[in-house]
Each structure stands twice: as C-alpha cells, then as structure tokens.
Amino acid sequence: MGWIRGRRPRHNLEMSEFHNYKLGLAKSDFSTRCQKQRCPVIKSKCRENASPLFFCCFIAVAMGIRFIIMVTIWSAVFLNSLFNQEVQIPLTESYCGPCPKNWICYKNNCYQFFNESKNWYESQASCMSQNASLLKVYSKEDQDLLKLVKSYHWMGLVHIPTNGSWQWEDGSILSPNLLTIIEMQKGDCALYASSFKGYIENCSIPNTYICMQRTV
C-alpha cells in the first residue's frame, strides 16, 4: 500500500504535464489555423483596397493623355488661324478717296479679297462688273500691304506666248524688279502670293482673286 501511495502523486503529476502539453499543442494548432484562415481574408481586403487606387490612377492617366491631346489640337488650330488670317491693314494711312463699301482703302488704291473660287477669266469679269480690275502690282512702296497676303489669288497678269513677256490687263509690261515669277505649273496666268511672288498657273483652274480700283 505504501508503494502504491508513493506512485500516485507522481502519476498525477505526469498526467497533468501531459494534459498541459496537449493543451499547448491544441492552442498552437488553433493559433496556426487562425493565422492561415486570416491571411486570405487580409489579402482579399488588400486587393479590395488596391482596386479603387488602381482605378483612380487609371482615370488620372487617361485624363492626362486627354489633356495633352486637347492642348495639341488647340495649338494646331491656333497656329493655323495665325498663319492664314486675313490681311491686317494699318489705320493710320493717308486718305485715299472713296472706295466701294467693305473694300480696303490703302494709299490711293481700293482692294477687295474675294474668297469665292473662279478661273482667271471669271475673276476678271467679276472685277470688271464692279468697275475694277484684277490686282496689278506697280509699286512695292505703295502696295506694301501685299506682303501680308498669305494664300494664292488671281492677279491681272498674263503670259504673251508670241514674245514670251508678261503683261498686265492694261497692256503694260511687268517690271522685272516688282515680282519674282515662279513656275508652279504650265500656264499663261499668274497667282499672287506673299512677299511679291507670282506663281504661274493654268488659267482654267479655280482660285480666289483680288480686285483693285485706282482712286487717282
């Protein structure tokens, strides 16, 4: 009996330690399972939080690209309008007499720039119907406004095949120091462009034109 009593406390101690050990393992296993179960949840939440951020970044980039495109378009439109704007005439020039309504009065001459396209003969007839003629260049000083012209317009200059000269509608010969004639196409008529240049063109091709009326 003494031996049995002596062993029971030891047995109880071992059982208690074994029970505590199993309890510790159970807690550790439970903690591990909890951590494993929580990780997908946390990752899912991270993805959910990342989605709005990614969407916001995508929207910001798209808006930035759109802004750059719009600025490029606006710049192109502005530059196009700048280089193709109508002739700006100084208002301080001396009085040059009466001109038809809406015509430009400049240094004893009246000018009108017509945007409708006609061939050379139709353009000439249109000017004559308004008691004017197609543009004649006779002086770089008195007609310095012609430096501002940006596009091509019919003027009253034609080629005479018999002698190879260029003449104005009134029969006068072109002075070589007034215009630089450039052969753009085969033809017997000439278009005026900027900086006192004339471009050879087929007379039957429609173009805009300039009418001119002398006041003196």
From Swiss-Prot:
Principal subcellular localisation of the protein: membrane
InterPro entries tied to this protein: C-type_lectin-like, C-type_lectin-like/link_sf, CTDL_fold, NKG2D, NKR-like_CTLD
Extracellular side: 73-216
Keyword GTP-binding: no
Entry keywords, A to Z: Adaptive immunity, Cell membrane, Differentiation, Disulfide bond, Glycoprotein, Immunity, Innate immunity, Lectin, Membrane, Receptor, Signal-anchor, Transmembrane, Transmembrane helix
Chain segments annotated as transmembrane: 52-72
Keyword check for Isomerase: no
GO annotation, cellular component aspect: cell surface; external side of plasma membrane
Quaternary structure (record): Homodimer; disulfide-linked. Heterohexamer composed of two subunits of KLRK1 and four subunits of HCST/DAP10. Interacts (via transmembrane domain) with HCST/DAP10 (via transmembrane domain); the interaction is required for KLRK1 NK cell surface and induces NK cell-mediated cytotoxicity. Can form disulfide-bonded heterodimer with CD94. Interacts with CEACAM1; recruits PTPN6 that dephosphorylates VAV1.
Name of the protein in its database record: NKG2-D type II integral membrane protein
Protein source organism: Macaca fascicularis
